């Protein structure tokens, strides 16, 4: 994935909600996952997506001490819930704006089917598909311990 230009972020080892596991739990979940990703992919993640989107000030503070921001989303396709490719496509195309972060889950075949349609369609509409780090860099950067859902112009 890294060789193809994808960015690999941290999503915890056990999909535990950061707001429920305290500082030690966050350090353990995020730290061990960073180590495993480094071992497998050869890169250490610089971004963290909280499971379920659950994040609070205390969790952000811990992530900040680990040098990581929390990356959220501005479009939730709810693909995990309905598992319908056309519904995912319609949601994205109806809502998408420059600087959006779109939440989709690669574990469902219907999401992959939607991506096959969305990628060329979004490109045809003039959107550039970039990593979150690239998007953040284009729009002024990103800081550890902060939460980001989009990067509007």
Label each PLM-derived region with a short phrase.
Residues 1-108, 142:
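Metal-dependent polysaccharide deacetylase catalytic core of the NodB/CE4 family, i.e.
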Residues 110-153:
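C-terminal domain-boundary segment and adjacent tail
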């Amino acid at each position: 994935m890294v060789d193809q230009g994808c960015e690999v972020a941290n999503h915890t080892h056990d999909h535990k909600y950061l707001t429920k596991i305290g500082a030690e739990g966050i350090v353990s979940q995020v730290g061990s996952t960073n180590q495993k990703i480094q071992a497998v992919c050869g890169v250490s993640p610089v971004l963290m997506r909280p499971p379920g989107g659950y994040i609070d000030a205390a969790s952000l503070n811990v992530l900040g001490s680990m040098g990581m921001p929390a990356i959220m989303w501005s479009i939730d396709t709810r693909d995990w819930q309905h598992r319908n490719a056309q519904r995912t496509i319609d949601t994205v195309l109806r809502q998408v704006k420059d600087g959006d972060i779109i939440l989709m889950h690669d574990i469902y075949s219907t999401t992959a089917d939607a991506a096959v349609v969305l990628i060329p369609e979004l490109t045809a509409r003039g959107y550039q598909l970039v990593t979150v780090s690239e998007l953040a860099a284009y729009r002024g950067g990103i800081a550890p311990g902060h939460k980001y859902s989009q990067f509007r112009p």
